[in-house]
């Protein structure tokens, strides 16, 4: 029988711990998000982790429970729109703990509201001098994209919108430059020939609606 044995001392905490929320997204409209967790240690056998912060049921580190280390984890953010911070601590098999890694994301569950002023005229033709209708619109929050088009009903969603083109001279019927301020007053001009194309070529009265998409990816109703 052997009269000796090997005993390993390991006091090194897990290295290179990092976390991303929804692949590094800045905004989310959904409280349920996906975490991507990483650790640079070559072998993570026996590792565990704690997740806390703006997390339902785990506001503080002591509220969180140790669970088996995983590179992916779905969590639910706490109620209330605003900046959310999630922390992750990784512990090795002999309970050396890493420093907390963190990531942030802004929760925005609100639906943008669009306000239209105008139009200056409610009937147009294709004849110069009578072929243009102008209006202005604003949104109640910062938005990244907008579109103006014909919809079948007043309560139609953006997926039903036939965007009015700009071939005939219409302007500001769509945009995707991003970060449009909520205070920005956008003037849109609809030209008769473009309106006719969007309408399928037939005369008649049509519903024109403006949609904006906020930075969380939610379109106005």
Predicted regions and their residues:
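Low-complexity, disordered linker/stalk regions enriched in Pro/Thr/Ser/Gly
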Residues: 1-221
């Amino acid at each position: 029988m052997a009269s000796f044995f090997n005993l390993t001392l390991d006091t090194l905490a897990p290295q290179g711990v990092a976390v991303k929320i929804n692949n590094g997204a800045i905004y989310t409209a959904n409280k349920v998000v996906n975490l991507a967790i990483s650790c640079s240690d070559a072998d993570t056998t026996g590792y565990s982790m704690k997740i806390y912060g703006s997390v339902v049921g785990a506001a503080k580190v002591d509220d969180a429970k140790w669970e088996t280390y995983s590179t992916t984890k779905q969590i639910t953010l706490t109620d209330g729109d605003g900046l959310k911070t999630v922390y992750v601590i990784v512990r090795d098999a002999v309970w050396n703990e890493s420093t907390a890694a963190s990531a942030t994301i802004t929760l925005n569950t609100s639906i943008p509201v669009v306000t239209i002023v105008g139009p200056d005229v409610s009937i147009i033709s294709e004849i110069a001098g009578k072929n243009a209708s102008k209006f202005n619109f604003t949104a109640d929050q910062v938005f990244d994209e907008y579109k103006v088009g014909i919809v079948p009903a007043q309560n139609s969603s953006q997926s039903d919108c036939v965007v009015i083109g700009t071939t005939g001279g219409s302007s500001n019927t769509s945009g995707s430059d991003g970060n449009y301020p909520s205070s920005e007053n956008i003037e849109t001009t609809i030209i008769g020939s473009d309106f006719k194309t969007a309408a399928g070529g037939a005369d008649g009265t049509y519903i024109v609606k403006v949609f904006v998409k906020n930075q969380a990816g939610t379109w106005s109703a």
